[in-house]
Amino acid sequence: RQYRHLLCDETITKNFRVIAFDMPWHGKSNPPPGFRDNEYRLTTELYKETVMTFCRDYDLVNPVIMGCSMGGRLTLHLALEQAEYFRSVIALEGADKLEPYYDLSWLHRPDVHGGEVCAAFVSAQIAPQSPDEYRWETLWHYMQGGPGIFKGDLYFYWHDGDFDDRSPRINTKTCPVYLLSGEYDSSCTPERTIDTAERITGARTTIMEGMGHFPMSENPELFKKFIYPVLEEILDA
């Protein structure tokens, strides 16, 4: 749902087949059988395997991959390991090194409403200029999350996904890398994005003014200003 505005944008879909899928445990996708017996933790290997299995099963041709937040981090891993497969990667709010800044235990407790606390934790990541309608639409996605899922996702986002020791090996001549981060993002900050770009030779960086952590959903009209030129450059390459 976070990508619904891109899915119906004719400027984009006239040149690209846009596919957005729900990871297991997320959105309309169910968790696997027996999920109740284990704590959910998204690891780098599981994430990569899930995305690449989806891509290969759909027989994608010359694909461009774009992800936001934890998805942005994942695209950078794929730029390193699947450079020959992807035409380009677009990391929205994605960096190769991040640091936790709040206690994750609050995200899955019996005495706290999980959906509301998850939305509260990310609410400050949305730019103050973003339209109220889309602000609350974005927060609703977090309010609807399953028990412990956001906490499990952050295991990858804040811990297992760090790879600043290997990101300098990304070859942007084979797989161009675009880093786009909002100026109001206090998680994947502009500074962390720039640091990442400095480790990845040839990475193209845009700090999006007036944008927070969820560009494609919190302010889809403003996002066009930043994503259209990137897609045009990919088409022209």
Residue ranges and their predicted role:
Residues 100-101, 114-172:
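Conserved alpha/beta-hydrolase catalytic His-Asp/Glu region
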Residues 17-66, 225:
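Active-site loop/oxyanion-hole signature of alpha/beta-hydrolase fold enzymes
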Residues 173, 179-181:
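Short beta-strand/loop motif that positions the catalytic acidic residue
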Residues 183-188:
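Acidic catalytic loop of the alpha/beta-hydrolase fold
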Residues 203-237:
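Catalytic active-site module of serine/aspartate enzymes centered on a nucleophile-bearing elbow/loop
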Residues 67, 71, 75:
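Gly/Ala-rich beta-loop-alpha elbow adjacent to hydrolase catalytic centers
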Residues 76-117:
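Flexible "cap/lid" loop of the alpha/beta hydrolase fold
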Residues 1-7:
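The serine-hydrolase catalytic nucleophile loop
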